[in-house]
């Protein structure tokens, strides 16, 4: 299966440099343009199914792809961004001031750090991988697109490559980008990472 991983377009919190976990922000005008550009870039990929995180910013992006490809959007809860809990809406400076112990653990061992009032990155990775495996079971030879989020996509890529979870810090997933993972029984390959060629900044 070819799994095309699309990160949603820009929101106000992305622009402001604030944590956007499962907060339900909508796309900015720039974000809508990014989503439209992604949709245009995917027309020749032979996609048969569109999946999306349930969060508004992802669904909006997926709906633009849906309009372009003429395929319905199937919402999958496991594709949601990591639940950032009390950190949602904070800047990095805010987090370090209010949650110094958590941030120290996050810097040292992000896989074991549970976001205050939220979930761990390890749990988010587990559910993202579970969704990918369900897509593989249903479309073993197909091409599907999943619209999701920064941590969800980054940790899924690490899992596909059998990298430690902390390696997500070395995987950049920009807004409106496309990454492609080939999933086969016993063999996974990342064939495209963070492609932004379709975007005009």
Positions of PLM-derived features:
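Short active-site segment of divalent metal-dependent hydrolases/proteases
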Residues: 11, 152-153
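Short basic (Lys/Arg) and small-residue
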Residues: 149
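Acidic, low-complexity terminal tails and accessory targeting/binding regions
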Residues: 2, 38, 71, 75, ...
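Extreme N-terminal starter segment of soluble prokaryotic enzymes
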Residues: 1-4, 49
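Active-site signature of alpha/beta-hydrolase-fold catalytic machinery across serine-
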Residues: 64, 155, 159
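Phosphate-coordination/substrate-recognition cap region in phosphate-metabolizing enzymes
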Residues: 36-103
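Loop-to-helix element that buttresses phosphate recognition and phosphoryl-transfer chemistry
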Residues: 10-65, 114-129
């Amino acid at each position: 299966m070819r799994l095309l991983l699309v990160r949603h377009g820009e929101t106000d919190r992305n622009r402001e440099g604030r944590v956007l976990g499962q907060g339900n922000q909508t796309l900015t005008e720039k974000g809508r343009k990014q989503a439209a550009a992604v949709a245009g870039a995917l027309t020749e990929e032979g996609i048969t199914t569109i999946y999306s995180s349930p969060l508004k910013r992802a669904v909006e992006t997926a709906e633009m792809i849906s309009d372009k490809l003429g395929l319905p959007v199937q919402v999958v809860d496991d594709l949601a961004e990591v639940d950032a809990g009390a950190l949602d809406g904070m800047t990095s400076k805010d987090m370090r001031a209010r949650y110094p112990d958590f941030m120290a653990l996050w810097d040292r061992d992000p896989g074991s750090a549970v976001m205050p009032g939220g979930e761990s990155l390890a749990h988010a990775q587990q559910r993202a991988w579970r969704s990918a495996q369900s897509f593989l079971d249903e479309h073993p030879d197909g091409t599907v697109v999943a619209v999701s989020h920064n941590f969800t996509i980054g940790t899924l890529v690490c899992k596909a490559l059998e990298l430690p979870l902390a390696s997500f810090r070395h995987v950049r997933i920009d807004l409106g980008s496309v990454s492609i993972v080939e999933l086969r029984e016993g063999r996974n390959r990342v064939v495209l990472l963070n492609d932004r060629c379709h975007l005009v900044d």
